[in-house]
Amino acid sequence: MTNENSIGIEFDFPEGILGFENIKTFIIKDSKHKPFSIMQSINKDVSFLVTSPFNFLNEYLPNIEEKDWSDIDAKAEDEKVILCIINMHVNDYKDITANLKAPIIINKKKLLGKQAICTNEKYSLRHKVFKE
């Protein structure tokens, strides 16, 4: 990925993102706020802050269904990337949360993505990123 002012990498999301099903193409680019990236629709109307859940939760085991991976034609482990959407609508950085229940899964070789629903019940839509 490239810096925030550049184009980034374009990914197709055939099913869109939950709540944004009509938006099918996103660009993922680096953010100046590491370890976060920006996932922005190509028309720039919608954007999300995303990061790897492994940046703050080493043992994230979402149990993503095999069908979800096959929907984006991801078979080999080196093709698979998992990201989570970050909620920054807070007054204090300690209250930043990540959606671990519905991760973004990506086939980085075929440039395809999907929002999956993880079957592991221990994860929530608002997992605190920073421990107090």
From Swiss-Prot:
Localization per Swiss-Prot or TrEMBL: Cytoplasm
Highest taxon listed in the record's lineage: Bacteria
Disulfide bond entries: none
UniProt cross-references to InterPro entries, sorted A to Z: Flagellar_assembly_factor_FliW, Flagellar_assmbl_FliW_dom_sf
Keywords recorded for this protein, A-Z: Bacterial flagellum biogenesis, Chaperone, Cytoplasm, Translation regulation
One term under GO cellular component: cytoplasm
Subunit structure: Interacts with translational regulator CsrA and flagellin(s).
HAMAP family: FliW (MF_01185)
Protein name per UniProt: Flagellar assembly factor FliW
Source organism (scientific name): Borreliella afzelii (strain PKo)
Gene name of the record: fliW
